[in-house]
């Protein structure tokens, strides 16, 4: 993880739209670009390749 907590929180505390992959605010109810309501939290750890 990053050594700067504020920067890490700013980058990782997001919701991702399952339809268009747009980044949304953490308190969003629907996507800012396409209006889709199925949002997931951004992954905090990288996936293994």
Swiss-Prot record:
Domain of life: Archaea
SUPFAM superfamilies in alphabetical order: Zn-binding ribosomal proteins
Residue stretches in coiled coil: none
GO molecular function: structural constituent of ribosome
Keyword Ribonucleoprotein found: yes
GO BP terms: translation
Annotated keywords: Ribonucleoprotein, Ribosomal protein
Keyword match Ribosomal protein: yes
A single GO cellular-component term on record: ribosome
Residue ranges of the TM segments: none
Family: Belongs to the eukaryotic ribosomal protein eL40 family.
Protein name stated in the entry: Large ribosomal subunit protein eL40
């Amino acid at each position: 993880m990053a050594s700067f907590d504020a920067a890490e929180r700013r980058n990782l505390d997001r919701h991702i739209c399952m339809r268009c992959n747009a980044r949304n605010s953490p308190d969003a109810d629907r996507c800012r670009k396409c209006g889709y309501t199925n949002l997931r939290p951004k992954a905090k750890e990288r996936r293994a390749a």
